[in-house]
A protein has these predicted regions:
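Alpha-amylase-like alpha-glycosidases and glucanotransferases acting on alpha-linked glucans and related
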Residues: 1-115, 123, 130, 167-171, ...
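Carbohydrate-interacting/catalytic domains
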Residues: 96-98, 109-117, 121-265
Length: 265
């Protein structure tokens, strides 16, 4: 069955879940990265003032990522039995949850590994999943939920049209940290790399706007691909395709609170 995908929901450290059976492995195509899921959701539950001390919850996954073929899961398990939906897990009040959820999904899609996103997450569901009921489609009558769905649609489109996000998911050459030591600022930056393109992903998970000096070797210009803070997604920024011009690979970027941005290098 060449078109069937076998994924293992496994929280153990057993080596070789995705190695071929002929090599002593279990033969799965992918293994759910439960560590990434737990660390990421715990981070976004945390109040912004405490995120600095939890900064490396979002860097730890790359310490072990290449040990198996990991898949990043935001599955049905995370939106049932009193755990709250993905949107509800975000810190803060109603209006604060949406920009954080958008930034979370930008981080997820830029991070190496295939993605699993459970139905209802894309509309900002507030009610936990119930197999006896359909999704709460009436949420799409509300502007923030409309904008969130629009964001998820565009995020999927950007992901699918830029091989840097997926071509070398399981190749060490496909990912490189730009900056993972901004504990006080809660800023992260890394590159995704394919044979023909490079994309820089930059995140500000603090509750304040910040200017940041982004350093990318050999880069002269950056072309904006996507910002989680564009107005059509519920943010405050006007969409712009204007390229950023740097000097000696250094770019000054303005990072809104709770935001992510992708740039074609």
């Amino acid at each position: 069955y060449p078109t069937v995908i076998l994924s293992a929901e496994d929280s153990t450290s057993f080596p070789g879940v995705t190695k071929p059976v002929s090599e002593g492995g279990l033969g799965f195509d992918y293994k759910w990265d439960m560590g990434w899921m737990n660390d990421t959701l715990n981070y976004f539950r945390t109040e912004p003032k405490y995120r600095s001390e939890n900064y490396h919850k979002l860097t730890f996954s790359m310490m072990y990522y290449y040990d198996d073929r990991f898949l990043l899961p935001l599955s049905h398990d995370e939106v049932v039995h009193g755990k709250a939906t993905i949107l509800q897990k975000m810190s803060g009040q109603y209006e604060e949850k949406f920009p954080q959820a958008r930034a979370l999904y930008m981080y997820m899609y830029a991070h190496p590994g295939k993605k699993l996103n459970f139905m209802g997450n894309e509309i900002g569901q507030f009610r936990e999943w119930d197999e006896k009921r359909e999704q709460d489609w009436n949420l799409l009558e509300f502007p923030l939920h409309q904008c969130f769905l629009r964001f998820m649609e565009e995020l999927n489109g950007i992901y699918g049209s830029h091989p840097a996000f997926y071509e070398k998911d399981y190749d060490r050459e496909g990912f490189e940290w730009i900056d993972c030591h901004q504990e006080e600022k809660c800023i992260y930056a890394f590159e995704r790399i394919s044979r023909k393109e490079r994309v820089a992903a930059v995140f500000n998970f603090s509750d304040r706007e910040q200017e940041y000096l982004l350093k990318i070797q050999d880069a002269k210009e950056l072309e904006p691909l996507l910002s989680s803070e564009w107005k059509e997604f519920g943010g405050k920024e006007t969409r712009s395709s204007k390229r950023l011009t740097g000097s000696r690979g250094e770019f000054i970027v303005s990072l809104p609170a709770y935001s992510g941005g992708d740039y074609l290098v």
